[in-house]
Amino acid sequence: MDKKKLNPLARFRGFIQAGATLLTNIHLPNFAKGTLYQGSGKYVCVPGLNCYSCPGAAGACPVGAFQAVIGSSKFRFSYYITGILILFGVLLGRFICGFLCPFGWFQELLHKIPSPKLSTKKLKPLRYLKYAVLLVMVVLLPLLAVNELGMGDPFFCKYLCPQGVLEGAIPLSLTNAGIRAALGKLFTWKACILLAVIVGSVVFYRPFCKWLCPLGAFYALLNKVSLFQMRVDTHKCV
Protein backbone atom coordinates (compact mmCIF):
# COMPACT_ATOMS: atom_id res chain seq x y z
CA MET A 1 0.00 0.00 0.00
CA ASP A 2 1.16 3.52 -0.81
CA LYS A 3 2.64 5.08 2.33
CA LYS A 4 0.90 8.35 1.44
CA LYS A 5 -2.46 6.59 1.80
CA LEU A 6 -1.38 5.19 5.17
CA ASN A 7 -0.29 8.61 6.41
CA PRO A 8 -2.10 11.63 4.91
CA LEU A 9 0.61 13.95 6.27
CA ALA A 10 3.12 12.30 3.93
CA ARG A 11 1.19 13.70 0.98
CA PHE A 12 2.00 17.23 2.09
CA ARG A 13 5.40 16.50 3.58
CA GLY A 14 7.40 18.60 1.12
CA PHE A 15 5.17 21.62 1.71
CA ILE A 16 5.43 21.16 5.48
CA GLN A 17 9.23 20.98 5.25
CA ALA A 18 9.39 24.11 3.10
CA GLY A 19 7.02 25.97 5.42
CA ALA A 20 8.94 24.92 8.53
CA THR A 21 12.22 26.06 6.97
CA LEU A 22 10.70 29.42 6.05
CA LEU A 23 9.21 29.97 9.51
CA THR A 24 12.49 28.99 11.16
CA ASN A 25 14.31 31.55 8.99
CA ILE A 26 11.60 34.15 8.54
CA HIS A 27 13.85 37.23 8.71
CA LEU A 28 14.74 37.08 5.02
CA PRO A 29 15.85 40.75 4.59
CA ASN A 30 18.78 40.05 6.91
CA PHE A 31 20.40 37.90 4.23
CA ALA A 32 20.86 41.00 2.06
CA LYS A 33 21.90 43.16 5.02
CA GLY A 34 24.41 40.65 6.40
CA THR A 35 23.00 41.06 9.90
CA LEU A 36 21.46 38.76 12.50
CA TYR A 37 18.05 38.98 14.11
CA GLN A 38 18.67 39.63 17.81
CA GLY A 39 15.16 39.99 19.15
CA SER A 40 13.39 38.09 21.91
CA GLY A 41 12.74 35.16 19.58
CA LYS A 42 16.38 34.15 19.96
CA TYR A 43 15.60 33.12 23.55
CA VAL A 44 13.35 30.38 22.18
CA CYS A 45 14.77 27.16 20.74
CA VAL A 46 13.48 25.89 17.41
CA PRO A 47 12.90 22.12 17.13
CA GLY A 48 15.23 21.36 14.20
CA LEU A 49 18.91 21.86 13.43
CA ASN A 50 19.13 25.52 12.43
CA CYS A 51 22.11 27.78 13.07
CA TYR A 52 21.73 30.68 15.50
CA SER A 53 24.08 32.69 13.25
CA CYS A 54 21.90 32.34 10.17
CA PRO A 55 20.84 35.88 9.16
CA GLY A 56 17.23 34.78 8.85
CA ALA A 57 17.06 32.62 11.99
CA ALA A 58 14.02 33.38 14.13
CA GLY A 59 15.15 31.33 17.14
CA ALA A 60 18.06 29.53 18.74
CA CYS A 61 19.45 26.14 17.80
CA PRO A 62 18.76 23.73 20.69
CA VAL A 63 22.17 22.05 20.31
CA GLY A 64 24.02 25.36 20.28
CA ALA A 65 22.01 26.70 23.21
CA PHE A 66 22.64 23.58 25.28
CA GLN A 67 26.39 23.76 24.63
CA ALA A 68 26.45 27.47 25.48
CA VAL A 69 24.93 26.73 28.88
CA ILE A 70 27.11 23.79 29.88
CA GLY A 71 30.23 25.48 28.51
CA SER A 72 29.65 28.59 30.62
CA SER A 73 32.02 29.36 33.49
CA LYS A 74 28.92 29.69 35.70
CA PHE A 75 27.42 26.42 34.55
CA ARG A 76 24.10 25.54 36.06
CA PHE A 77 21.94 22.73 34.74
CA SER A 78 19.55 24.33 32.27
CA TYR A 79 16.05 23.10 33.05
CA TYR A 80 14.66 25.34 30.30
CA ILE A 81 16.76 24.01 27.42
CA THR A 82 16.69 20.41 28.64
CA GLY A 83 12.98 20.71 29.31
CA ILE A 84 12.16 22.10 25.89
CA LEU A 85 14.21 19.38 24.20
CA ILE A 86 12.35 16.72 26.17
CA LEU A 87 9.05 18.45 25.36
CA PHE A 88 9.86 18.46 21.64
CA GLY A 89 10.94 14.83 21.86
CA VAL A 90 7.88 13.61 23.77
CA LEU A 91 5.35 15.56 21.70
CA LEU A 92 6.88 15.15 18.25
CA GLY A 93 9.88 12.80 18.41
CA ARG A 94 11.38 11.94 15.04
CA PHE A 95 8.51 13.78 13.34
CA ILE A 96 10.77 16.80 13.77
CA CYS A 97 13.51 15.12 11.76
CA GLY A 98 11.20 14.10 8.94
CA PHE A 99 9.00 17.19 8.71
CA LEU A 100 10.43 20.21 10.54
CA CYS A 101 14.23 20.16 10.23
CA PRO A 102 15.69 22.55 7.61
CA PHE A 103 18.95 20.63 7.24
CA GLY A 104 17.13 17.34 6.81
CA TRP A 105 15.07 18.87 4.02
CA PHE A 106 18.23 20.25 2.41
CA GLN A 107 19.71 16.75 2.26
CA GLU A 108 16.49 15.35 0.80
CA LEU A 109 16.52 17.93 -1.99
CA LEU A 110 20.11 16.97 -2.81
CA HIS A 111 19.11 13.31 -2.92
CA LYS A 112 16.62 14.10 -5.69
CA ILE A 113 19.51 14.98 -8.02
CA PRO A 114 19.68 12.22 -10.66
CA SER A 115 22.64 9.96 -9.86
CA PRO A 116 23.42 6.38 -8.83
CA LYS A 117 21.97 5.81 -5.35
CA LEU A 118 23.67 3.71 -2.69
CA SER A 119 21.94 1.77 0.07
CA THR A 120 22.86 2.38 3.71
CA LYS A 121 21.66 -1.07 4.77
CA LYS A 122 25.18 -2.44 5.24
CA LEU A 123 26.24 0.76 7.02
CA LYS A 124 23.76 0.49 9.90
CA PRO A 125 26.50 0.37 12.58
CA LEU A 126 27.41 3.94 11.60
CA ARG A 127 24.08 5.07 13.07
CA TYR A 128 25.57 4.71 16.54
CA LEU A 129 28.05 7.49 15.75
CA LYS A 130 25.42 10.15 16.33
CA TYR A 131 24.99 8.99 19.92
CA ALA A 132 28.75 9.33 20.43
CA VAL A 133 28.59 12.83 18.92
CA LEU A 134 25.76 13.71 21.33
CA LEU A 135 27.60 12.42 24.39
CA VAL A 136 31.15 13.52 23.56
CA MET A 137 30.90 16.69 21.46
CA VAL A 138 27.67 18.16 22.81
CA VAL A 139 27.94 17.22 26.50
CA LEU A 140 31.34 16.03 27.74
CA LEU A 141 33.83 18.20 25.84
CA PRO A 142 32.09 21.55 26.45
CA LEU A 143 31.71 20.59 30.11
CA LEU A 144 35.20 19.21 30.77
CA ALA A 145 37.59 20.75 28.20
CA VAL A 146 37.58 24.28 29.59
CA ASN A 147 40.05 27.16 29.41
CA GLU A 148 41.63 29.09 32.27
CA LEU A 149 38.38 31.01 32.74
CA GLY A 150 36.42 27.80 33.12
CA MET A 151 34.66 28.16 29.77
CA GLY A 152 34.27 25.38 27.22
CA ASP A 153 33.88 25.63 23.46
CA PRO A 154 30.69 24.52 21.68
CA PHE A 155 32.62 21.65 20.11
CA PHE A 156 29.87 20.31 17.87
CA CYS A 157 28.93 23.72 16.48
CA LYS A 158 32.55 24.82 16.14
CA TYR A 159 34.15 21.73 14.64
CA LEU A 160 31.51 19.49 13.08
CA CYS A 161 28.15 21.10 12.31
CA PRO A 162 27.85 21.80 8.54
CA GLN A 163 24.66 23.80 9.03
CA GLY A 164 26.65 26.62 10.60
CA VAL A 165 28.70 27.04 7.42
CA LEU A 166 25.71 26.70 5.11
CA GLU A 167 23.40 29.09 6.96
CA GLY A 168 25.84 31.28 8.86
CA ALA A 169 29.39 31.65 7.59
CA ILE A 170 28.66 31.58 3.85
CA PRO A 171 25.75 34.08 3.68
CA LEU A 172 27.36 36.44 6.21
CA SER A 173 30.73 36.39 4.43
CA LEU A 174 29.05 37.25 1.12
CA THR A 175 27.84 40.58 2.49
CA ASN A 176 30.36 41.37 5.22
CA ALA A 177 33.97 42.10 4.25
CA GLY A 178 35.14 41.87 7.86
CA ILE A 179 33.82 38.33 8.19
CA ARG A 180 35.36 37.37 4.84
CA ALA A 181 38.75 38.61 6.02
CA ALA A 182 38.46 36.62 9.25
CA LEU A 183 37.76 33.28 7.57
CA GLY A 184 40.60 30.84 8.14
CA LYS A 185 41.50 27.21 8.58
CA LEU A 186 38.47 26.42 10.71
CA PHE A 187 36.15 27.68 7.98
CA THR A 188 38.04 25.59 5.43
CA TRP A 189 37.64 22.51 7.63
CA LYS A 190 33.92 23.11 8.13
CA ALA A 191 33.44 23.85 4.43
CA CYS A 192 35.03 20.48 3.63
CA ILE A 193 32.58 18.79 6.00
CA LEU A 194 29.69 20.58 4.31
CA LEU A 195 30.98 19.55 0.88
CA ALA A 196 31.26 15.93 2.03
CA VAL A 197 27.68 16.03 3.32
CA ILE A 198 26.46 17.56 0.05
CA VAL A 199 28.17 14.91 -2.07
CA GLY A 200 27.10 12.17 0.33
CA SER A 201 23.49 13.35 0.27
CA VAL A 202 23.31 12.97 -3.48
CA VAL A 203 24.07 9.25 -3.31
CA PHE A 204 22.92 8.38 0.25
CA TYR A 205 19.60 9.33 1.81
CA ARG A 206 20.17 11.95 4.56
CA PRO A 207 23.62 10.70 5.65
CA PHE A 208 24.23 13.42 8.23
CA CYS A 209 20.88 12.74 9.88
CA LYS A 210 21.53 9.01 10.02
CA TRP A 211 25.13 9.03 11.17
CA LEU A 212 26.15 12.30 12.82
CA CYS A 213 23.24 14.45 14.01
CA PRO A 214 23.15 14.70 17.83
CA LEU A 215 19.69 16.26 17.78
CA GLY A 216 18.34 13.28 15.88
CA ALA A 217 20.07 11.01 18.39
CA PHE A 218 18.32 12.76 21.28
CA TYR A 219 14.91 12.58 19.63
CA ALA A 220 15.49 8.92 18.76
CA LEU A 221 15.94 8.16 22.46
CA LEU A 222 12.43 9.51 23.07
CA ASN A 223 10.79 8.04 19.98
CA LYS A 224 9.11 5.17 21.85
CA VAL A 225 7.29 7.56 24.18
CA SER A 226 6.53 10.35 21.71
CA LEU A 227 3.02 11.06 20.44
CA PHE A 228 4.31 10.94 16.86
CA GLN A 229 6.27 7.73 16.45
CA MET A 230 8.41 6.47 13.59
CA ARG A 231 7.37 3.00 12.47
CA VAL A 232 8.95 0.83 9.81
CA ASP A 233 6.81 -0.79 7.12
CA THR A 234 8.66 -4.10 6.84
CA HIS A 235 6.88 -4.88 3.58
CA LYS A 236 8.71 -1.95 2.00
CA CYS A 237 12.15 -3.06 3.23
CA VAL A 238 14.58 -4.48 0.70
Name each region found by the language model.
Residues 1-238:
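Non-ligating segments of multi-cofactor redox enzymes
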